[in-house]
Amino acid sequence: MQSRKSLKPEKTVQTVFSWDSPGLMAGVDEAGRGPLAGPVVAAAVILDPFNPIMGLADSKKLTALRREKLYDEIQAKALCCSIALATVEEIDSLNILQATMLAMKRAVEGLRLKPNKVLVDGNRLPTLKILAEAIVKGDALVPAISAASILAKVYRDRWCGDYHLQYPQYGFAGHKGYGTAEHLAALRQHGACPQHRKSFAPVAQVLR
């Protein structure tokens, strides 16, 4: 992994150990379904039961500083982590739900260790060749899903920071691509950039 805080988006990023073990369970979650810009990011995490991580919770309930610290700790202590994304182009061609499922599928397939079961936050499942279960509010109930939610959220927030430097007029570093009043005003003033989701109504309106 890059040592600096900001990351360029990649299809898959992972940290692993080189040994396998039966009975492995992976938690999966996503970040970025709602924003008007940027990829949707998914993460899959297999935690080490002998190396626990304290303070795991739904990423939305944590401060940005706490998420950053847990991101590094998860990368260091988990047996295996994988982060993947679906691009803006894929979101526009597939729709956001199918793009989210694709990102989750890529995250699971990016794990070096093959889990016996996958627990996914929410009520939908990606198409997998592994036993999987959807857990509503799983990011608050299952530590591995909490860890995945933190990885996905931090990775995507860093992506927004990178693209803020490229397109400062939109304020991506602040609103993370969501449809805030500031973001909508910038869209009306500057039009859409290549990272805006053209299939989303507020973006489509300025392209007419």
From Swiss-Prot:
State its cofactor: Mn(2+); Mg(2+)
User: Per its UniProt entry, which superkingdom is the organism in?
Assistant: Bacteria
Gene3D superfamilies reported for this sequence: Ribonuclease H-like superfamily/Ribonuclease H (3.30.420.10)
Quote a single Gene Ontology cellular component term: cytoplasm
Q: Which GO terms describe its molecular function?
A: manganese ion binding; RNA binding; RNA-DNA hybrid ribonuclease activity
Q: Does the keyword Metal-binding apply?
A: yes
**What EC identifiers does the entry list?**
3.1.26.4
Q: In Gene Ontology terms, what is a biological process of this protein? A: mismatch repair
Where in or outside the cell?
A: Cytoplasm
Q: What is this enzyme's class at the first EC digit?
A: hydrolase
| A family per Pfam | RNase_HII
Signal peptide bounds? none
List S-S links within the chain: none
- Cofactor binding remark: Manganese or magnesium. Binds 1 divalent metal ion per monomer in the absence of substrate. May bind a second metal ion after substrate binding.
Name the major location: cytoplasm
The reactions it catalyses are: Endonucleolytic cleavage to 5'-phosphomonoester
Domain RNase H type-2 positions: 23-208
Entry binding sites for a divalent metal cation: 29-30, 121
- Report the protein's function: Endonuclease that specifically degrades the RNA of RNA-DNA hybrids.
Name used for this protein in its record: Ribonuclease HII
Q: Provide the species name.
A: Polaromonas naphthalenivorans (strain CJ2)
The root-end lineage is:
Bacteria, Pseudomonadati, Pseudomonadota, Betaproteobacteria, Burkholderiales
